[in-house]
């Protein structure tokens, strides 16, 4: 049964054009071709990425945060309350009004005190500003290096300037070491992002992020073993071209450098729109949808690859909408937060703090919010 499924999965007619077999892609005469087995190394490399990330965040990002004066807002902790804690962990973090009244009777607190307890408890679970800065620093470093390395891999290739050459001789196209390592490192990084997504800072587009990571992993993997490598290198470099700008804008936002953050965000928005909504659909997708049909009839791999590209393009449109909405609010002076942010809740009243098990009032040292929203007065 398993052997039958294995044989069917690797059936040449699924992944290769007509009249071609996997035997045509075996190494010969000093020419090396991509193989599915090459991808096995990406899983241990992904674990290595997680280890490197841990030490990077500890010994590079944390000192950098201190250097840039990234500060936290002092948060009031919710006082111990077994009744409310049990509800919080088992039933929900935002009780409805009827549930608030029930919890009020069970805990002996007023409804206002119960609501305040849940606000504080939710804020306790929200990631710290330092955690956000560390993550942004790590992603910025990778995306910047990956973009530079990717451009170095493709800038001297003829298909970078003439996309019809992407399919010249396909699929009998040998690989070179720079393409191999570019692919393995990119795929390993996205595996590491998927492995760590549960513990990373969660945003409102959490589900979209998962879809993006999975689609990217599938696309990179398929484009490798089906030898769509030339197109794949173009797509990866194009994606990396704007990601490092977004992460750097986040870093400066968390540091309170408002002007720098806003200026970088504007550059990011322009680059994102040009690369994801112009170059990708009208050049790259045109290259992968139209040109192959001039060489061979459509087959399953052709439809599969372009379907995954379509999923990514839909995500790009969704994110472009959020970016443009943020840019409009920024221009009109109405921007209050990142459209994808998990905003920290503030205390609506200080009068009930003592009864709720209060303590000292919150003293904001430096209030870091998502992109383009900060309460600092620092102008750089």
Predicted regions and their residues:
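Membrane-helix and juxtamembrane interface regions of eukaryotic multi-pass membrane proteins
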Residues: 1-230, 250-256, 260-272, 280-311, ...
